[in-house]
């Protein structure tokens, strides 16, 4: 009894601490939000000038990350919304809507009256009813210098059949946040986690909300069991059995004044209705087998064929008090919820190129240790180096690591350590984090994202696809355009700061239909 009482008391203490921190963050961020609300209102005034929907063919979108890429439920289309771009001095936020036709390989820019305000790090979920609906919740807006943030708590729906935006107002929903995750479960949207940040404070969440698509009402769920600790940027997917898997993510905590320590989570949990009741949920800790991804943040997720969850890229940051360095990834993993097992996704290479090669390493035994930021097997990876000359003359070197070929989405057996036939896979997307992923007709599409070259952030605008049934080779649909790679050195001058404010959103007062910008 004594131990149980202490445990419950400790739990209540943690809840009180979290409540105090949220109140503190809310108070300090209110002034910042008031400043940014005025800027957001200015851009909404510009957007209000649109009176009719205009669809025009266009070149591929400009570089960005932390946008949403969604699959149209009825057409051969991918829908890109929002995102951000940083050029070293200015933070740009977007609320543009692009449609990519996967069959025709064409882009269309769709300007719709009264769209959601500019944002990034939001969540977008497509449901089939009514000819298709795209539901968008939350995300963030940043000041031009990227030092102040406004976190949205609004809910929008894009009616795909009529191409109209609608803001859905309902009380009792989640607080303002970004980096959260949201999935469609039956006729509900289930939302988990995220974070809220002001200039000096931040808070991470592990709460769960449900939005009913029939009654348009929010409800906060209180699952039993031990669930994930507060985090953002996790994997969240629905299993064929009707559960919801949450994996990984990122959070940080203050260890001393002005010093924060980040945590890359690698644990997995299952959220499911208890006893079949949709009003009562339970968390269960999971321990999947197989070849797991190395701990990382900034990875991207999509649903693959056979109800598998696809996991791509990310970054493993090594944090010190005065510096931050990271290793970026372009590897693929599949999680099979039916077998509760991870698989590495490796390319087989074109069938026309047949070589005999020995596999570099076997699958690690379950529970085996792996390096925190990845590591090579016996057969070393092949590294391709590509130099891109930006418009300003800067040479950006892209290093791409190709792993040894193997089976995709299947466990490795000891027999597979013998000689096998495989070709060398073609180069695909370079290592990156915060990319946009979507799967349509068994084909994976990877768009944009970012990586770092020294002190420079390179934001991408390339588009690649991979047939997940064949797993032979990547195909580049849009190459990275050097002319879009602008990087300005940091400046502390007030004059430059004033110039930046006019550039936020990427539009002038005279033209509200051009590019805008964002920050995660």
Swiss-Prot record:
Kelch repeats lie at residues 77-129, 133-187, 188-241, 243-289, 308-361, 443-494. The keyword Phosphoprotein applies. The modification Phosphoserine is found at residues 413, 418. Residues 1-33, 346-379, 402-431, 481-520 are annotated as: Disordered. Residues 11-24 have a biased composition (Basic and acidic residues). Residues 1-10 have a biased composition (Basic residues). Keywords: Kelch repeat, Phosphoprotein, Repeat. It comes from the Eukaryota. InterPro entries: Kelch-typ_b-propeller, Kelch_domain_protein. Disulfide bonds: none annotated. This is Kelch domain-containing protein 4. The lineage of its organism: Eukaryota, Metazoa, Chordata, Craniata, Vertebrata.
């Amino acid at each position: 009894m004594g131990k149980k009482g202490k445990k419950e008391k400790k739990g209540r203490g943690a809840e009180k601490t979290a409540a105090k921190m949220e109140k503190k963050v809310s108070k300090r961020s209110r002034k910042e939000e008031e400043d940014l609300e005025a800027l957001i209102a200015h851009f909404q005034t510009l957007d209000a000038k649109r009176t009719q929907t205009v669809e025009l063919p266009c070149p591929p979108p400009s570089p960005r990350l932390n946008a949403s890429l969604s699959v149209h439920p009825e057409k051969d289309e991918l829908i890109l919304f929002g995102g951000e771009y940083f050029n070293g001095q200015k933070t740009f936020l977007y609320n543009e809507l692009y449609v990519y036709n996967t069959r025709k390989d064409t882009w269309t820019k769709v300007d719709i009256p009264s769209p959601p305000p500019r944002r990034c790090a939001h969540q977008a979920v497509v449901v089939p009813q009514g000819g298709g609906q795209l539901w968008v919740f939350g995300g963030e807006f940043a000041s031009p210098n990227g030092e102040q943030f406004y976190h949205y708590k609004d809910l929008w729906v894009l009616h795909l059949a009529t191409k109209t935006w609608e803001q859905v107002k309902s009380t009792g929903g989640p607080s303002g946040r970004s980096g959260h995750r949201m999935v469609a479960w039956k006729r509900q949207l289930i939302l988990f986690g995220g974070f809220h940040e002001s200039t000096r404070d931040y808070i991470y969440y592990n709460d769960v909300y449900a939005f009913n698509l029939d009654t348009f009402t929010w409800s906060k769920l209180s699952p039993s069991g031990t669930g994930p600790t507060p985090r953002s940027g996790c994997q969240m997917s629905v299993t064929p059995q009707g559960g919801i898997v949450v994996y990984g993510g990122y959070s940080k905590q203050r260890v001393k004044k002005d010093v924060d320590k980040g945590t890359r989570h690698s644990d997995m949990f299952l959220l499911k209705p208890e006893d079949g009741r949709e009003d009562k949920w339970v968390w269960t800790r999971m321990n999947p087998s197989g070849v797991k991804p190395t701990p990382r943040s900034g990875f991207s997720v999509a649903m693959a064929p056979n109800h598998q969850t696809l996991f791509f890229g990310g970054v493993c940051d090594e944090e010190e008090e005065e510096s931050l360095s990271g290793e970026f990834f372009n590897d693929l993993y599949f999680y099979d919820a039916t077998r509760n097992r991870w698989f590495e996704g490796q390319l087989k290479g074109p069938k026309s190129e047949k070589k005999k090669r020995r596999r570099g390493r076997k699958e690690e035994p379950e529970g085996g240790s792996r390096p925190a930021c990845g590591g090579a097997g016996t057969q070393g990876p092949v590294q391709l180096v590509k130099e891109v000359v930006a418009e300003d003359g800067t040479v950006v070197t892209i290093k791409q690591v190709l792993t040894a070929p193997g089976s995709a989405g299947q466990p490795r057996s000891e027999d597979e350590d013998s000689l096998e036939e495989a070709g060398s896979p073609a180069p695909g997307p370079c290592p990156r984090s915060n990319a946009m992923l979507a799967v349509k007709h068994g084909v994976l599409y990877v768009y944009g994202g970012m990586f770092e070259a020294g002190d420079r952030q390179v934001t991408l605008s390339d588009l690649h696809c991979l047939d997940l049934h064949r797993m032979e080779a990547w195909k580049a649909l849009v190459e990275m355009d050097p002319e879009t790679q602008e990087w300005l050195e940091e400046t502390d001058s007030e004059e430059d700061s004033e110039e930046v404010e006019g550039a936020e959103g990427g539009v002038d007062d005279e033209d509200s239909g051009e590019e805008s910008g964002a920050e995660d």
